[in-house]
């Protein structure tokens, strides 16, 4: 019995190569793997992109079959291959690096070759027997990388969008719940890291929920507006060369049906092939969310600082020992990690922006970097938001006595008294308190500027944290 061959020979315009016998990709994918050893992140790292590529190929095959250009047996085999990819099979065969030259041709050929070889086996042939079903002639029929790839990127983003929104919404709800829990905890608000006026810890956390809620609403509206127009059918530059006149409409209709997304043909296929503006805007929205998350995490780190020599108004749940040399130290590792994710997303947006600007004439060859950065930003943000909610926000507790102590000893409390004792008295009390180290309330009582009943009324939390003004007595 002869040993099973460990490789097969495939050829292209540059010559021949040995392809591993068990590989469903082919020679062009192998060349790309050998050429682009850059990020170390293969296409399979982003399953939604792989699924989207398979959906594009299925839609193209359906349209070509309906138009009479693709035989039934080939259509059936391609359909089976695409269905398996959509289910999650064979994703490990998508081995090309996310960063690549060629405007995404390596990605497109990785998909074409994998689908072709799965289909060949379904037809009873062996991998590489392309005379029966060809990656270019059949799987890539009526397509160019320049319309199939950007369409798949848009679709992949849409397919993963709901998961991102769900993570953001869950984080918002966690902040909102803390807003309710801490509604009665009076504390000092701060501006420029200096004491300002009283507020509640609940108001502070509610504001976190509100600012992220704004981004949730915008992201919900933005993706359907930006990403549903596709250039599938435009082929090389948007003119539709080598495609049946009826292909574009049918292919987009089939892709919408297969994916469940409200896809529609771009109004100007040449513009849609060359312009990356939709990705720039969508990435900018992801950056905005990252900026907000980072600012919130800055606040959480400050508010939990100490525990003895910092603000120490809240306790973050301890996640791990914080130092190899300082016993007992616990660091705010979860907010710190989210800060770093935010910096990465901000950097991704800049790289994507430069790639979008780097296009020339009818095509932007930098689209692989655009795809890599935007999928990476989504993955990082989703994971960071889940981590922040699960390992930090839900376990935060308030140091109620510490919050009250800081309010009582803050010079900022004089602002609440200003309408009742006047600006000059308030300024003098504040100055004396600072110089002597005594409390504002102690000095007000000593000088009998207000009676106890009035003072107690002013100092009620509900009266200090919302608009309220009683005229000065004559």
UniProtKB/Swiss-Prot annotation:
Task: Tell me which residues bind L-aspartate.
Answer: 105, 144-146, 191, 324, 329
* GO cellular component term of the entry, any: cytosol
Summarize the biotechnology note. Catalytic efficiency establishes PA-AspA as an efficient enzyme for the production of the industrially important substances L-aspartate and cinnamic acid. Catalytic efficiency can be enhanced through protein engineering and enzyme immobilization which can improve the production ratio.
What is the activity's pH dependence per the UniProt entry?
A: Optimum pH is 8.0.
Q: Name one GO biological process term.
A: tricarboxylic acid cycle
Describe activity control.
Answer: Does not require any divalent metal ion for activation of catalysis, but the activity is slightly increased in the presence of Mg(2+), Mn(2+), Ca(2+) or Co(2+).
EC number(s) stated in the UniProt entry for this protein: 4.3.1.1
What is this protein for, i.e. what is its function? Catalyzes the reversible conversion of L-aspartate to fumarate and ammonia. Can also utilize L-phenylalanine to form cinnamic acid. Exhibits the highest specific activity towards L-phenylalanine, but catalytic efficiency is 3-fold higher with L-aspartate.
Family affiliation: Belongs to the class-II fumarase/aspartase family. Aspartase subfamily.
What protein name does the entry list? Aspartate ammonia-lyase
Q: Which organism is it from?
A: Pseudomonas aeruginosa (strain ATCC 15692 / DSM 22644 / CIP 104116 / JCM 14847 / LMG 12228 / 1C / PRS 101 / PAO1)
Name the gene behind this protein. Answer: aspA
